């Protein structure tokens, strides 16, 4: 038995990107699941606008959750995916023109990275107060990561976003508030310097 969460507190507001960093297996995904209601702890408190969420159910208009692994059925078309999330396919193509003409293409026909782009965009662009993004940049090409970071910055104007990814430089780059999950606790950090002091990353001299 390994207790990965025992004193973790997180706050996110509309207009904010909150980044969570931590070692592999350190509890980042567990924290996301607790917030979303997929995982129940003995002592926990999750609230939106001061109203406690007492059940496991989360309304899409309140919160969307991007799982670490692919979650869209392979037989669905791209347009069906976006329709399910209330997102216009045309808006997606404006941001990612490489996908023009793929509205009827099935998800199983795309590469892993392409599927990730579609899934992340569907969650991000949907009408919800908050988005939880677990490893959104996995398998994406650098060009697409950069574009998705622009989408995140745009979408944060109307929602709060919590993100964790092993591409820590990208998380640092887009986060308004940055935390590290370590030994079951969440610590606020102020950029690379604090992460170096905590031993999460090496300093610029390679030490």
Give residue spans per PLM region.
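Conserved structural motif at the start of ABC-family nucleotide-binding domains
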Residues: 5-7
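The feature captures the beta-strand-to-loop junction immediately N-terminal to the Walker
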Residues: 21-23
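Helix-to-loop junction immediately C-terminal to a conserved catalytic motif
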Residues: 36
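ABC ATPase NBD coupling module
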Residues: 51-64
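Q-loop/switch helix immediately C-terminal to the Walker
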Residues: 65, 69, 74-90
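Walker B catalytic motif
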Residues: 135-136
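Conserved beta-strand-loop-alpha-helix hinge in the C-terminal portion
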Residues: 185-207
